[in-house]
Amino acid sequence: MRDWGRGHIEIDWSPGYEGLFEWLGSASGSTVERFVAEIERRDGLEVARRRFREGPAHALIFPNLFLGETNIAIVQPVSVEECVHWHTPMFWTGVPEWNGRLLRMAEAGMGPASFLMPDDLIIAGRNQLGLHARTSPWLLLGRGLNRETTDADGRIVSHITDETTNRGFWRHLRSVMTEA
């Protein structure tokens, strides 16, 4: 978990990946071999292999651009009770054979609820109910406060189960809203 500041946050799933392209369903075959060779030639073996293992970003660019591995989403607030969630799969230039796979993955992952995982929809619904709670505070974001550290780049980092990213987003939103 990384809080980059100013509401920008990242969930780093890469420690859970060991092999190349695990984040893409362990893709293989001649198309993959050709793509790997081209990127290794362009970027060097070490950089290319790291990218293939780590996968794309899982991040929120404040206020509403979400990069969810192979999906791109924009959340457009309409009112306190409603928002529009636009999403599209990320397509790659130069490997059209993969774009069909990326589209199918987006359809499977994003589904009719427009969330990456069914659990996310449940969580969003519970958060919406929390907006109507008559108790204060209705939302607690303390998990992992004791594990947060600051890395050499000035980012607040913590364990994958911590709420560092939530705190970073809401901290910045509060500062922006109180300045308005």
Segments (PLM) and residue ranges:
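C-terminal catalytic domain of Rieske-type non-heme iron oxygenases
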Residues: 1-180
